[in-house]
Amino acid sequence: MAPFRQDSILIIYPRSQTTLVQFGLNEETFTVPELEIPTQIYRTTRQDGSYTYHSTNKDNKAELIKPIQNGEIIDISAFTQFLRLIFVSILSDRANKNQDAFEAELSNIPLLLITHHSWSQSDLEIITQYVFESLEINNLIQLPASLAATYSMISLQNCCIIDVGTHHTDIIPIVDYAQLDHLVSSIPMGGQSINDSLKKLLPQWDDDQIESLKKSPIFEVLSDDAKKLSSFDFGNENEDEDEGTLNVAEIITSGRDTREVLEERERGQKVKNVKNSDLEFNTFWDEKGNEIKVGKQRFQGCNNLIKNISNRVGLTLDNIDDINKAKAVWENIIIVGGTTSISGFKEALLGQLLKDHLIIEPEEEKSKREEEAKSVLPAATKKKSKFMTNSTAFVPTIEYVQCPTVIKLAKYPDYFPEWKKSGYSEIIFLGAQIVSKQIFTHPKDTFYITREKYNMKGPAALWDVQF
């Protein structure tokens, strides 16, 4: 089969709150998704009991349906209609912009749909049938979100995906490029848990103000070291010489009191050079354009979520039988989800994982082992080693049977400038872009369902090409 046009590839990533959509890939580099829409649709009931679906509630009589909750599809009919809404909207938009679009990018659209681990086999087959028979799309791949995350890292063989959602967090182990379905685990805590904690600290604030604080650049998670160093005073350090130069002429011509100008300038310089963690108070803007002042609460609210995630990760990964695979998984932790864009969140979660699960040789055992190793060395070697430290290569190390002895975050790719600029909280979508380009622009059709395969086997064709 001939490769598809890159500007014809459609990627849809449905989630509980919002859905990310991109139609057409950039020829030169991958970019962040162009559309983020609420995962919802309106439904009205006819007299015969059947339903009709709408994008808006024009007459205020329609029922609002959110077909996905905690990643799981709870209304498959509403979900398929939601997919239709997206597809028809794209067709309409492109056709209005270009009358010849149906002979170009709209002539043959391949769809990559990112799926959640909780979707049942029945859900996946119903979606497949709807895509081919109702939407009349001729080529489809359903890609699990966990595998999309691994491909964003250029195909990690062993890793652990921690996907922090709004109301839940998924922990998904990947071993030998395969999702371990029997070990996939979820906890009923996510970004909303942070809001709930902040609400207790700031009971006078409404929900919108708390959400605005959480999304503001001044909201961050401080490491233990940063908390110790944070003094909350207005020290003014490392000022540039240019910033210390007075413009006397400007002060004179301004007509203002000299002392007032100097005091204002000094305050500005101090605030400019002080870290957020050193300020007793800082301000942010809410969605209504109001400037709001907040204290230490901007560093709080995440601890409980982080501790619970760390605990569940440990319980999950302890069930991996192969010790070598388990070690490799611990060395490639991938943290994704909108909540992880909070400054310091990933680092704090890594710190908690190290604190809770890292296996370190006790100091007494280490000292005893080093002394025993030195005692069996030849005399000549001892003379040579008297100027060496205890960490010389002569002292053997112990390979512990338990794991983890190393816990690390997987290295994010740095050769996608647009993604690097915006952050990697939605890196699952980047993985989908990589996969779609590799598969849909390749002449072989091994990894996706074609119209020919569907006509032969129907929705069951999905299981012959599952990625």
UniProtKB/Swiss-Prot annotation:
Keywords: Chromatin regulator, Nucleus, Transcription, Transcription regulation
GO molecular function: structural molecule activity
SUPFAM superfamilies (UniProt xref): Actin-like ATPase domain
SMART domains attached to this UniProt entry: ACTIN (SM00268)
Signal peptide as annotated in the record: none
Subcellular localization, as worded in the UniProt entry: Nucleus
Coiled-coil features, chain-numbered ranges: none
Single GO cellular component term: RSC-type complex
Pfam families (UniProt xref): Actin
Stored InterPro entries: Actin, ATPase_NBD
Function: Component of the chromatin structure remodeling complex (RSC), which is involved in transcription regulation and nucleosome positioning. RSC is responsible for the transfer of a histone octamer from a nucleosome core particle to naked DNA. The reaction requires ATP and involves an activated RSC-nucleosome intermediate. Remodeling reaction also involves DNA translocation, DNA twist and conformational change.
Family statement drawn from the similarity comment of this UniProt entry: Belongs to the actin family.
Identification of the protein by name: Actin-like protein ARP9
Organism: Saccharomyces cerevisiae (strain ATCC 204508 / S288c) (Baker's yeast)
